[in-house]
Amino acid sequence: MVSLNGHSTWVRRPRGHGPVVTLLHGGMSDSSSMLRRFEKRLSGDFRLAAFDRRGHGRTPDRPGAFHYDEMADETVAFLEYLGEPSHLIGHSDGGVVALLTAMRRPDLVRRAVLVGANYHHDGLVIAPEFPLEGPEFDEWARDFGEMSPDGVEHAREVVRKALALFASEPTLTTSDLATVAVPVLIMSGDDDVASLAHTCAMYEAIPGAQLAVLPASSHAVLKEHPGLANRIIRRFLLSELPVTTLAPIRRATHSVRGDPIPNL
């Protein structure tokens, strides 16, 4: 445990060789799942780091609502603790946090991968729900209580805070996204919680962004297609930038209306 912004926080320090990749978990989750997804596939080229955000996993909660801006502050504090710039891979809430962190401190972020993320809460196809009673809640609360210093009795409060967050944040605009100054890969399932229109709007708004929509997949795309998702992410993190393609349109630095598309 280390102190981030005065709060005791569980961290996983970088191990191995290569650039640092910081894994940012989703809401009502913790770093364990992200480490399982990426440990074997990325550790040969990168040093993986992670931390559990306030009220998640092994990090205790504190009074007050959850806010993405505060989560980004936590992430900035963690990157400053590491003492070097890092790639970010964030899933769901972690993707929102990665985006905000990249906007706030591009000097600390090499590249950012946003998986199943949204830039505005109205981009969600359905309103997030989670039961506060019944078998599904009981199972989640049991797992939460086994890990959290706050114990199982705090589980309902965390769910309430998370649902309130999902319903009201983030509130970014495409004009905000246009200020992103680090390379970004946006990844989603073709049946994700954010609409494809919302995901594509994010892709169009972020300068130089790359987009990967994986077929036959949902918000659990990292679990459903781990090999494919990891290959795409690894290629993005290791590739030379800026991207060059045979028939650039969006990426063309100069375009003339009516220029023929190369014969492929």
Model-derived features with residue positions:
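Conserved HGGG/HGGXW glycine-rich cap/lid loop of the alpha/beta-hydrolase fold
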Residues: H7-R58
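Active-site loop/oxyanion-hole signature of alpha/beta-hydrolase fold enzymes
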Residues: R36, K40-S43, A49-I89
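Flexible "cap/lid" loop of the alpha/beta hydrolase fold
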Residues: V96-R104, L108-R142
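Active-site nucleophile elbow and catalytic-triad environment of alpha/beta-hydrolase enzymes
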Residues: R160-D176
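Short beta-strand/loop motif that positions the catalytic acidic residue
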Residues: V180, I186-S188
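Conserved alpha/beta-hydrolase "acid-adjacent" motif
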Residues: V193-H198
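Catalytic histidine neighborhood in serine/cysteine hydrolases
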Residues: T199, Y203-A220
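Catalytic active-site module of serine/aspartate enzymes centered on a nucleophile-bearing elbow/loop
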Residues: P215-L264
